[in-house]
């Protein structure tokens, strides 16, 4: 990998700002391969150099990928004066490295939300032509039936004339209050709520379970998060690169 400035490498971990790194170097508290760093502007290979600050070894990541179990009541934004955002749920070191949510969940929607600083991956997952699967659990007022499933497969046209791509509705429970799994491959504003409202079945609860190959970790409580594994990152990249077709056509 190309060499980078020491202050940039350390700042990428989110632990210290570049200004703080300069101070730490001046105080002799930064070691590179066991030697005291002479300057914050020194360059080294971030993948092979052993860098420590105050005796703690730091590990370089080109990009960061965080799986969050988003709770209701939190905004899918990096900052918003109207209320708490998903970044407010993260530890301070994750708030300094440019993470942003990949797509948005409504304020009252729960479930899987990916946060990253990898713009290329985010584009692949969100680009309309990619049609990456997103699966949701939904609870509605009103009994869902076969006619609703067929309408989803055919592609619902909303009241404002907006045409939705074919989607999949899998009914889990049909009663006065129904439950279902919905698979869509686009992300229009309030899409699932509007699709079901057009069928006379208003949504009372909505939770995203997966996006592409990435499935919400059942071990994460609402508001908790963890870093993605190397395997999850690899599979997610493949989801964005190779997704194609229509949700109602191949399942």
Question: Language-model features: where?
Answer:
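Basic, flexible Lys/Arg- and Gly-enriched helix-loop patches that mediate nucleic-acid binding at interfaces
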Residues: 1-251
